[in-house]
């Protein structure tokens, strides 16, 4: 599906199943629930938005300088490899399951609720100029084999980190 520099605007709930989605500089949005499944997603400088729950399943997603967000509900992501460099992922609650997350200068944020990351390898910045932010309005739950961070990891309430290898040079 090619939505490069385009607009797909659903007035109701919207399901999109495609092999490949090019949403580079595009806008894919739903006034209700958005359910997106694709092997590869290019959301570079694009927007994937839902007023209600946003569910995204993908093997590879490039969200460089892009936005993936739900205004009034949750974002549930199952992505094998996520590039969120200078990108933003936000919702009331955010859940991410995957194998690799690169979050250089990116932000993943639950506005008022929980941020749950179950990712094998998390890179939240490897230098001060590439520091990312993982921010939970309430509870932060991270389960990972490896977590490298020069960025901010913040919980408004409790933080539960289950990590086998931690390199943290930023704020925790």
Which residue stretches match the model-derived regions?
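Surface-exposed loop/turn motifs in large extracellular/passenger domains
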Residues: 10-18, 32-38, 50-58, 71-80, ...
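Short, T/G/N/S-enriched strand-turn elements that build extracellular solenoid repeat scaffolds
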Residues: 3-9, 23-29, 42-49, 63-69, ...
């Amino acid at each position: 599906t090619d939505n490069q520099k385009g607009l797909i605007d659903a007035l109701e709930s919207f399901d999109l199943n495609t092999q490949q989605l090019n949403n580079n500089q595009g806008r894919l949005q739903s006034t209700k629930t958005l359910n997106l499944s694709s092997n590869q997603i290019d959301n570079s400088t694009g927007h994937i938005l839902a007023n209600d729950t946003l569910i995204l399943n993908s093997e590879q997603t490039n969200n460089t300088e892009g936005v993936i967000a739900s205004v009034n509900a949750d974002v549930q992501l199952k992505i094998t490899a996520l590039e969120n460099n200078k990108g933003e992922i936000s919702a009331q609650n955010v859940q991410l399951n995957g194998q690799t997350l690169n979050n250089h200068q990116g932000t993943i944020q639950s506005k008022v609720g929980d941020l749950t990351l179950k990712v094998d390898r998390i890179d939240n910045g490897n230098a001060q100029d590439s520091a990312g932010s993982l921010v939970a309005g309430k509870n932060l739950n991270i389960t990972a084999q490896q977590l490298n961070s020069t960025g901010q990891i913040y919980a408004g309430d409790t933080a539960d980190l289950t990590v086998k290898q931690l390199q943290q040079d930023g704020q925790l």
